[in-house]
């Protein structure tokens, strides 16, 4: 009888151990399943963020293409002529509000393209603002982002305005040569938009 009781006790202990092991395995499986769900949730959030980034980039490209249709495309830039006269700072702010900057020619090809575009889109206009100035340090010309200008296309005897004339004009009558001018003068201008690659 004691032997039967011992056998029954061993069977009950074995069943309890088996159930405990089975329960522990199920708990581990649930934890693993929760971790996989959490990981997938993180992956989905990352994918959604990437999609939003792509959607916003496509919106920018579409807006830029609209600008390019109204203006002209040169190399990896689009140019868009202004409607009215503004002083240098207002012109730059207007270009920024449209997603661009005041035009900055970086080589002779861009000078030629600007001259052609300026004649077509700003008929009768002798000069327009460039995104170049020496407001911070006299004689050190930088673009509107503060980067030093390496390509220069000054007209004869220019720059000549000293501290009174810190902003730069593109002169149609001087075949695209530059001159310095008082930044408070009201002039036409051309905005430049970089085409994403």
From Swiss-Prot:
SUPFAM superfamilies: C-type lectin-like. Residues 1-22 form the signal peptide. Residues 74-192 form the C-type lectin domain. Its main location: secreted. GO terms for molecular function: carbohydrate binding. PROSITE patterns: C_TYPE_LECTIN_1 (PS00615), C_TYPE_LECTIN_2 (PS50041). Restricted to cartilage and breast. Also expressed in breast cancers. It is found in: Secreted. It comes from the Eukaryota. Keywords: Disulfide bond, Lectin, Secreted, Signal. GO terms for biological process: ossification; skeletal system development. Disulfide bonds join 68-78, 95-191, 167-183. One of its GO terms (cellular component) is extracellular space. Gene3D superfamilies: Mannose-Binding Protein A, subunit A. InterPro entries: C-type_lectin-like, C-type_lectin-like/link_sf, C-type_lectin_CS, CLec_Tetranectin-domain, CTDL_fold. Promotes cell adhesion to laminin-332 and fibronectin. PANTHER family: C-TYPE LECTIN DOMAIN FAMILY 3 MEMBER A, TETRANECTIN-RELATED. This is C-type lectin domain family 3 member A.
